[in-house]
Amino acid sequence: MINLADLCLVGLVLAYSLNLAPMMFESFTSDRIWASNPPDSFHMFLGQYGQKTAHYWRVVSPLAAMTFILSFIFNWHLVDRMFWLFAALALYVAVQLATIAYFVPEQEGLIASAPWLSRDVLQARAQRWILLNHFRNVAGLLAYGFLMCALLARSQAL
């Protein structure tokens, strides 16, 4: 029979997957497109029908944070899981902070300043964004791996 600690952890893996999968999808599809030929490639974000994903992230990111909290509350007494949960949380927070502090503002800034910046500057900054995004993706995948380790760890209490 599944207990509440296990159920919270399964919910966390699901909620985290709703964060990780689109992040990876964007990295391999739309991110490569918008960074391919700035400023022309920025058109995918412009206009009435431009791509806007903020509404998705405003729902999914808090859901993952909430399930992290619930998982900590209900798994606190399970020593074999806590290390993995802390490691996953640290990477999740690092990815979220990097996204908030650099990735979103830089992308929005590039699009907004496209009329004033040279193609070379736009291209260099877009390529730097893509390069740094690889590290963000690795951190996201590692966090997922740590969550799977927590899920597979024994449910042995302190």
Predicted regions located by residue number:
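Interfacial segments of alpha-helical transmembrane regions
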Residues: I2-S17, I73-A94
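Interfacial loop at the N-terminal end of multi-pass membrane proteins
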Residues: A5-A64, P105-Q127
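Hydrophobic residues within the alpha-helical transmembrane core of Major Facilitator Superfamily
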Residues: S17, I69, V93, G145-M148
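Structural signal for membrane-spanning alpha-helices in multi-pass inner-membrane proteins
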Residues: M23-E26, F68-N75, T99, L147-L151
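Internal alpha-helical transmembrane segments of multi-pass membrane proteins, especially GPCRs
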Residues: H55, F86, Q127, H134-N137
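Core segments of transmembrane alpha-helices
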Residues: V60-S71, N137-G145
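Mid-bilayer segments of alpha-helical transmembrane spans in multi-pass integral membrane proteins
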Residues: V93-A101
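Juxtamembrane boundary at the C-terminal end of a transmembrane helix
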Residues: A150-L158
